[in-house]
Amino acid sequence: SLFELGKMILQETGKNPAKSYGAYGCNCGVLGRGKPKDATDRCCYVHKCCYKDRYSYSWKDKTIVCGENNPCLKELCECDKAVAICLRENLGTYNKKYRYHLKPFCKK
């Protein structure tokens, strides 16, 4: 869910997820669409399948561990984990000018 995703992003990047990524670029946030503005925005672009059910995870030794017996929920958790790690790995591309990018200007 968005709650777990937000926690993962905070843990991986140290950034406030809503403030830093809630409207970042063309693809981060609820109305995300269009060509990614940079590598950070591309992380959100590939993360379009993860919003459905709530799942649980733990934070052990600075690593996200998805611990579900339900394979569907584990897959959702792994998807959120992947975007959180992608955002951390691309912190160097984070550009404040895209923080509140207007989605209508994004091209499909």
UniProtKB/Swiss-Prot annotation:
Disulfide linkage:
C26-C106, C28-C44, C43-C86, C50-C79, C66-C77
| Pfam families on file | Phospholip_A2_1
Return one GO MF term. phospholipid binding
Q: Which UniProt keywords apply?
A: Antibiotic, Antimicrobial, Disulfide bond, Myotoxin, Secreted, Toxin
Q: Site annotated as Hydrophobic membrane-disruption site (MDiS): where?
A: L102, F105
Q: In which tissues is it expressed?
A: Expressed by the venom gland.
User: Superkingdom of this entry's organism?
Assistant: Eukaryota
Q: What InterPro entries does this protein map onto?
A: PLipase_A2 (IPR001211), PLipase_A2_Asp_AS (IPR033112), PLipase_A2_dom (IPR016090), PLipase_A2_dom_sf (IPR036444), PLipase_A2_His_AS (IPR033113)
- For region Important for membrane-damaging activities in eukaryotes and bacteria, the annotated ranges are 96-108
User: Which residues are annotated as site, described as Cationic membrane-docking site (MDoS)?
Assistant: K103, K108
Its cellular-component GO annotations read: extracellular region
What biological process terms from GO does the record include? arachidonate secretion; defense response to bacterium; lipid catabolic process; negative regulation of T cell proliferation; phospholipid metabolic process
Predominant location:
secreted
Residues marked Important residue of the cationic membrane-docking site (MDoS) (site): K96, R99
**Known SMART domains for this protein?**
PA2c (SM00085)
Task: State its location(s).
Answer: Secreted
User: What is the protein's quaternary organization?
Assistant: Probable homodimer; non-covalently-linked. A model of myotoxic mechanism has been proposed: an apo Lys49-PLA2 is activated by the entrance of a hydrophobic molecule (e.g. fatty acid) at the hydrophobic channel of the protein leading to a reorientation of a monomer. This reorientation causes a transition between 'inactive' to 'active' states, causing alignment of C-terminal and membrane-docking sites (MDoS) side-by-side and putting the membrane-disruption sites (MDiS) in the same plane, exposed to solvent and in a symmetric position for both monomers.
**What does the UniProt record say this protein does?**
Snake venom phospholipase A2 (PLA2) that lacks enzymatic inactivity, but induces myotoxicity. Also causes an inflammatory activity that is demonstrated by mice paw edema induction and pro-inflammatory cytokine IL-1 (but not TNF-alpha) elevation. Also shows antimicrobial activity against Gram-positive and Gram-negative bacteria.
Tell me which family the UniProt entry assigns to this protein.
Belongs to the phospholipase A2 family. Group II subfamily. K49 sub-subfamily.
From the Swiss-Prot or TrEMBL record, give the protein name. Answer: Basic phospholipase A2 homolog BnuTX-I
